[in-house]
Amino acid sequence: MTLPANRTGVIAKKLGMTRFFDETGQHVPVTVLSLDGCQVTAQRTVEKDGYTALQLGAGAKKPKNTPNAMRGHFAKNSVEPKRIVAEFRVDEAALIEVGAEFTADHYVAGQKVDIQGITVGKGFAGAMKRWNFSGLRATHGVSVSHRSHGSTGQRQDPGRTFKGKKMAGHLGQETVTTLNVTVWKVDVERGLILVKGAVPGSEGSYVKVRDAIKKAAPADLPRPGAFRSAGEAPAQAAAETPAEETSAATTEEGEG
């Protein structure tokens, strides 16, 4: 039996949360993810790089704010500069042409996905908030130190605090992957993916969405993916321009 090729994930922008009501009347909290111009910016092949992967980019970025090296990289592949770039390992059969732009029907309703993002930073936090410690007693000899974490070591031997000891420190702002998130709905026209529950990150941050690695993928998934080829996007943009505006622009050029 031949297993289907490993598909690429996508980079999405977290817009926020809302809720829907299912057929039983229960409200379902969902997170809205937007495919903010997610395109293939480069390919990685075994012959050239030693592995197979797709480099994706998302979010518009001004060329003047793009480093020269990355500006040349994007220009070489004929794509606009991107705000964020990430790689996804894929099988050779799942490689997609450079410049292709992903659409929301890359995923289907009911599918399980894994979502990776950077959690909201909360600054310096004590042990009770950071690690859910119970704290010290309220009375019986305890003064001032009610919310402290208590002892940090043992005795003369080993005579030190072990690395990794749970103590007060920086909370949040770390990479977290939420597994087996359910896709509630996709909106192809607006490029939105709605998933049940919360995902890591603040509003406006970018997350990586991929097929769940611990759950079987639906049989009706598009392979190698759902996307518009590099030549289709400009034509579609031109088609969306109203005829009145086009004729008016032509008239103004003639008068000038």
Curated annotation (Swiss-Prot):
It holds the Pfam family Ribosomal_L3. Keywords: Methylation, Ribonucleoprotein, Ribosomal protein, RNA-binding, rRNA-binding. It comes from the Bacteria. Transmembrane segments: none annotated. GO terms for cellular component: cytosolic large ribosomal subunit. GO terms for molecular function: rRNA binding; structural constituent of ribosome. SUPFAM superfamilies: Translation proteins. Methylated by PrmB. Residues 229-256 have a biased composition (Low complexity). This is Large ribosomal subunit protein uL3. The lineage of its organism: Bacteria, Pseudomonadati, Pseudomonadota, Alphaproteobacteria, Caulobacterales.
